[in-house]
Amino acid sequence: METIAKHRYARTSAQKARLVADLIRGKKVAQALEILTFTNKKAAALVKKVLESAIANAEHNDGADVDDLKVAKIFVDEGPSMKRVMPRAKGRADRILKRTSHITVVVSDR
């Protein structure tokens, strides 16, 4: 049984979050949580929270055994970018893009 959890509009760029997602794809959930705990990146904490949510969803909604679960799929899509202005010298301004992403984790007992 596949169970999904999503974090939409996460305040990290998709490029940075994909680095973390690649570390745990296909792993058992216990091993994935261990990897994320010791990964020194902001995105690791965000991905860990989504993974814990997916595990809880599988346990509560589907009655799955946590020991059998593995990360079947994990992907990070780009969300909308917030546009901000940074003043520069001589009356100019630069545009700053505050990027967001949508993190999706699918756990399965198969």
From Swiss-Prot:
Keywords: Ribonucleoprotein, Ribosomal protein, RNA-binding, rRNA-binding. GO terms for cellular component: cytosolic large ribosomal subunit. GO terms for biological process: translation. It comes from the Bacteria. GO terms for molecular function: rRNA binding; structural constituent of ribosome. Signal peptide: none annotated. The keyword Ribonucleoprotein applies. Pfam families: Ribosomal_L22. This protein binds specifically to 23S rRNA; its binding is stimulated by other ribosomal proteins, e.g. L4, L17, and L20. It is important during the early stages of 50S assembly. It makes multiple contacts with different domains of the 23S rRNA in the assembled 50S subunit and ribosome. The globular domain of the protein is located near the polypeptide exit tunnel on the outside of the subunit, while an extended beta-hairpin is found that lines the wall of the exit tunnel in the center of the 70S ribosome. Part of the 50S ribosomal subunit. Belongs to the universal ribosomal protein uL22 family. This is Large ribosomal subunit protein uL22. It comes from Actinobacillus pleuropneumoniae serotype 5b (strain L20).
